[in-house]
């Protein structure tokens, strides 16, 4: 599974969380750990891209005008 497949964001995020959990155990053989790490990087990039696309698509209707959604400065996602 890669971050560029047709799976949904939630499925990709769940898989990424599972990979992190498995890597954090420190009990994987080297080859499996490296493969999971690579998959995790691909999934993270895919999730990041989907979030950015969603952020760009969000519009806020204010004063009769559609405006782009601006992430609040203090939001954790605003640091991306």
Swiss-Prot record:
<dbReference type="GO" id="GO:0009318">
    <property type="term" value="C:exodeoxyribonuclease VII complex"/>
</dbReference>
<dbReference type="InterPro" id="IPR003761">
    <property type="entry name" value="Exonuc_VII_S"/>
</dbReference>
<keyword id="KW-0269">Exonuclease</keyword>
<keyword id="KW-0963">Cytoplasm</keyword>
<comment type="similarity">
    <text>Belongs to the XseB family.</text>
</comment>
<keyword id="KW-0540">Nuclease</keyword>
<protein>
    <recommendedName>
        <fullName>Exodeoxyribonuclease 7 small subunit</fullName>
        <ecNumber>3.1.11.6</ecNumber>
    </recommendedName>
</protein>
<comment type="function">
    <text>Bidirectionally degrades single-stranded DNA into large acid-insoluble oligonucleotides, which are then degraded further into small acid-soluble oligonucleotides.</text>
</comment>
<dbReference type="GO" id="GO:0008855">
    <property type="term" value="F:exodeoxyribonuclease VII activity"/>
</dbReference>
<dbReference type="InterPro" id="IPR037004">
    <property type="entry name" value="Exonuc_VII_ssu_sf"/>
</dbReference>
<comment type="subunit">
    <text>Heterooligomer composed of large and small subunits.</text>
</comment>
<dbReference type="GO" id="GO:0005829">
    <property type="term" value="C:cytosol"/>
</dbReference>
<dbReference type="Pfam" id="PF02609">
    <property type="entry name" value="Exonuc_VII_S"/>
</dbReference>
<dbReference type="GO" id="GO:0006308">
    <property type="term" value="P:DNA catabolic process"/>
</dbReference>
<keyword id="KW-0378">Hydrolase</keyword>
């Amino acid at each position: 599974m890669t971050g560029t497949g047709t799976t949904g964001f939630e499925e990709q995020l769940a898989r990424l969380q599972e990979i992190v959990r498995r890597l954090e155990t420190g009990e994987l053989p080297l080859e499996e750990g490296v493969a999971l790490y690579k998959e995790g990087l691909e999934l993270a990039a895919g999730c990041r891209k989907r979030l950015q696309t969603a952020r760009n698509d969000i519009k806020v209707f204010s004063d009769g005008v559609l405006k782009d959604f601006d992430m609040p400065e203090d939001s954790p996602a605003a640091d991306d």
